[in-house]
């Protein structure tokens, strides 16, 4: 497929194109909200590839469950040339153990999967840092997590060609 020449489009045309793309992703069931599409895309990708059932938006502590009732918090982040941070979005009420595993996906700038891990709650709890001003924990999905006992590298399971 040929890429459109975005340089010739006005700012308004670019925003309209962006809106059309989001609407189509929602129509296809990839996006569930009109927020940053990386979060919805990550949830869709992980649930599809791992055979998980996505929960409704009312489940604050987890996003999906497997056939055995194991609860998964799913988070993704896109790495770019301007921002290579591996910090995932805030995790609230971490001590309450509302999920069994955090599945984190780091995407390359082109949205391909750079790496993905399934991380047990205990390891997230040990490695996350509490931030009082947001009343949440910050967790960095670093490649070095792969060496931690219990962390599963699921990159090949979720990578899209």
Label every PLM stretch briefly.
Residues 1-161:
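Nucleic-acid endonuclease domains
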């Amino acid at each position: 497929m040929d890429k459109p020449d975005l340089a010739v489009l006005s700012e308004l045309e670019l925003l309209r194109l962006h809106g059309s793309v989001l609407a189509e992703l929602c129509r296809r069931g990839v996006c569930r909200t009109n927020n940053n599409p990386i979060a919805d895309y990550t949830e869709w990708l992980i649930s599809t590839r791992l055979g998980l059932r996505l929960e409704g938006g009312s489940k604050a502590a987890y996003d999906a469950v497997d056939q055995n009732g194991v609860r998964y918090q799913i988070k993704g982040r896109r790495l770019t040339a301007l921002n290579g941070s591996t910090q995932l979005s805030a995790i609230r009420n971490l001590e309450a153990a509302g999920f069994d595993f955090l599945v984190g996906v780091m995407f390359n700038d082109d949205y391909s999967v750079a790496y993905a891990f399934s991380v047990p709650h205990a390891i997230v709890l040990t490695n996350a840092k509490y931030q009082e001003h947001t009343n949440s924990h910050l967790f960095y999905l670093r490649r070095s997590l792969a060496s931690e006992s219990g962390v599963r590298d699921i990159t090949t399971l979720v990578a899209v060609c």
